[in-house]
């Protein structure tokens, strides 16, 4: 098992690796993202993964390094131990990420079968 897989599987581990030179998003975090739309100034700087009461919980920090406000749509996709999606998926949530602002996104797995996740993001200029 790789160091990344171990860090994701263990409770209370932070995913913070070397910064990706292009986006500023750490490589381990970028592996968990699925993004639509163009927003190079929006960086997902850190993800915190915790298993509480056998339920996976994730917090993801987004930072808008630009001056333009962005409408952000997001949802977490929960996966089982072989990579299959669990359940029907979450509905999209939305918020405005102000220029030079930051926001923490929180997600809780629907049940204990979830062992992994992807954060899906979609961006629009406001």
Describe each model-derived feature in a short phrase.
Residues 2-11:
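Bacterial N-terminal signal peptides
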Residues 112-126:
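Short, surface-exposed ligand- or partner-binding patches at beta-edge/loop junctions that are enriched
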């Amino acid at each position: 098992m790789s160091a990344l897989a171990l860090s994701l599987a263990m409770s209370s581990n932070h995913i913070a690796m070397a910064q990706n030179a292009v986006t500023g998003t750490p490589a381990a975090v970028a592996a968990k993202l699925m993004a639509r739309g163009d927003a190079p100034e929006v960086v997902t700087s850190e993800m915190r993964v915790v298993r509480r009461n056998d339920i996976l919980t994730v917090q993801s920090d987004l930072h808008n390094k630009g001056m333009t406000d962005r409408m952000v749509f997001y949802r977490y996709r929960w996966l089982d131990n072989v990579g299959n999606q669990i359940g029907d998926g979450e509905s999209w949530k939305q918020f405005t990420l102000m220029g030079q602002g930051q926001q923490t996104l929180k997600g809780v797995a629907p049940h204990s079968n979830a062992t992994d996740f992807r954060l899906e993001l979609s961006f629009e200029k406001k």
